């Protein structure tokens, strides 16, 4: 569950509580007064909100505070053939947080897709680092900002290397030689 700290503004009372599977926690028989409730830790894949709420507790009354948590963002990378829009499998990307605090690499599947779930919020640079032999490497990285609770998509388009077919035919019969 999520861990919350509860502290009186006078400093006379302090405790922590962990929410149950229903997402709630109840404290009973605490002194009346003004308290600051702060989210301290959350289970994966959520992000600590770093917000506090102040609540006044009065004798004989129940007060409630609600915190809304967002999941860590997701990143989808799509790779397509620029000529026909078909997906390209086997392209490897480096995904780096701009501040250097997170880096990973991943390779497109048979649908030309990579999906990274639950990665840190922040700005990222996505760079193509390896392609199949028939694909031309795209040297221009893309930047994307990932926000809590959202999935962002970046799409890369690549050209396929040209091919050449040579035929040798008999001048009289037209049969292959």
Residue ranges and their predicted role:
Residues 1-177:
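Solvent-exposed loop/turn and edge beta-strand elements of beta-rich ligand-binding domains
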């Amino acid at each position: 569950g999520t861990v919350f700290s509860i502290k009186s503004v006078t400093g006379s009372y302090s405790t922590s509580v962990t929410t149950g599977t229903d997402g709630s926690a109840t404290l009973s028989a605490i002194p009346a007064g003004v308290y600051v409730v702060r989210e301290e830790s959350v289970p994966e894949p959520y992000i600590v909100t770093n917000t506090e709420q102040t609540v006044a507790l009065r004798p004989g009354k129940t007060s409630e505070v609600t915190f809304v948590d967002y999941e860590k963002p997701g990143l989808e990378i799509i790779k397509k053939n620029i000529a026909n829009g078909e997906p390209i499998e086997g392209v490897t990307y480096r995904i780096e947080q701009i501040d250097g605090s997170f880096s990973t690499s991943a390779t497109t599947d048979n649908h030309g897709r990579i999906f990274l779930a639950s990665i840190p919020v922040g700005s990222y640079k996505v760079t193509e680092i390896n392609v199949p032999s028939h694909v031309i490497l795209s040297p221009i990285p893309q930047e994307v900002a990932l926000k809590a609770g959202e999935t962002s998509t970046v799409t890369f388009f690549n050209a396929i290397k040209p091919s050449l077919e040579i035929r040798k035919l008999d001048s009289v019969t037209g049969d292959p030689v």
